[in-house]
Amino acid sequence: MKFSLPYVATFLGAFVAGAFAADPEASKDTTSQTVTLQFAVDYSIPHLPNVGPRDLAEVYNGEEFTIAYSFTNNEDKDISIVGVGGAFHDVKTGAIKSNLTASPIEAVTVTPGESGSFSHKVSLNLVPEEYILVPQLFIAFDNDLKLVQARGQRTEVKDVPISVFDPQLLLLEAILLATFAGLGYVAYNIWGKRYFEGTALVNKPKRGASPPVATAKSVDSDWLPEGHLRQKKTKKAN
């Protein structure tokens, strides 16, 4: 049976709304929503080639990362992958903390005994912390749509670190500097300029004023030595 994309999109929307929103208990355990098929599926994160299934994958908010799926059809009938989804689970409780957007894709059909692969991009906007990422594939099989859940991957979501050379940060710094410079200029014109001009007027000498002249004063001769007085009298006599 061939499913159209609008039909698949309607099914995915109904599945997410019914399975996870209407039934709070469904968010604690998704095993009851999955169907056992002879269909092996695995995935990797290409930009993290050294991260294995038991390792911690680090991804960043605001950035897209790619999930590369690989699968093998071990059933005796054709299987078609028609949609992708998944969820981020709590590390301790297993409860779903955020769903990946369930999206229809152009059908990827795998005949019995054959393998295939495809990639899907995921964008993030989550609270920075550690999760268990569990991708899901929506499968068209035996005239029905079923859900196949992949393995979990420990994933730490982080905010993008801010660099001092980030263009947006540099622009913000330039705006702040220009703002402070403008405020300083205004403050100088309002208060500083008047203050410095007033100080200069106080210290400026008056025009035409004569410079101070040293004047002689009479000195009491009682404290002068007697020899010094005799010398002065002798000079006068001469």
Swiss-Prot record:
A Pfam entry, by short name: TRAP_alpha
Alphabetized UniProt keyword annotations: Endoplasmic reticulum, Membrane, Signal, Transmembrane, Transmembrane helix
Stretches in topological domain Cytoplasmic: 191-238
Lumenal side: 22-169
Signal peptide: 1-21
Residues that span the membrane, as ranges: 170-190
Keyword Transcription among UniProt keywords: no
Main location: endoplasmic reticulum
Subcellular location: Endoplasmic reticulum membrane
InterPro entries: TRAP_alpha (IPR005595)
Entry superkingdom: Eukaryota
GO cellular component: endoplasmic reticulum membrane
Topological type in the membrane: Single-pass type I membrane protein
Family designation: Belongs to the IRC22 family.
Summary of the function given for this chain in its UniProt record: Is probably involved in a pathway contributing to genomic integrity.
Name of the protein this chain belongs to: Increased recombination centers protein 22
Gene designation per UniProt: IRC22
